[in-house]
Regions:
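Contiguous segments within soluble domain cores/interaction surfaces
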Residues: 2-135
Length: 135
């Protein structure tokens, strides 16, 4: 089995139009939080995968900066790859909980084999009066 992430993003909203085109809105890599634990109400993970022809099982896991899994029930998606076409995977993630600062990774596996990851950094929000000034 071979597979790769050809395009991947975390965003506020994702959809596939009738023509098969993927639209992403509000792409981000950082989430600013006032403190921990923090909860992000809604986000979408979008990945365009290049896969071998046939049926596949895609699993999305959230890994903390220490490498430990953070999602108790990772989403599993069954997909079918057709010759000459990429596979669009869109996962809606609601009420994601973060208990540590740092770079987390959404790891994608296809049929049990890691094909790549999408990073998201959880950073502490600075109070308005403490913003850094450029020199």
């Amino acid at each position: 089995m071979s597979g790769e992430i050809r395009l991947g993003a975390l965003c506020d909203h994702a959809l596939v139009g009738q023509d098969g085109k993927v639209s992403l809105m509000g792409i981000f890599r950082n989430i600013s939080v006032s403190g921990l634990p923090a909860q992000h109400p809604r986000m979408f993970l979008e990945a365009i995968l290049g896969l071998d022809v046939g049926a596949h099982n895609v699993v999305v896991r959230l890994l903390r900066p220490d490498g430990q899994q953070s999602m108790p029930n990772p989403p599993e998606i069954s997909v079918h790859a057709v010759a000459g076409q990429d596979v669009n995977v869109i996962v809606e993630l609601n009420n994601m909980s973060f208990t540590t600062y740092g770079t987390h990774k959404f790891e994608l596996t296809v049929d049990g084999e890691a094909v790549g990851s999408l990073p998201v950094s959880i950073v502490q929000m600075q109070p308005p009066g403490e913003r850094r000034r450029a020199n």
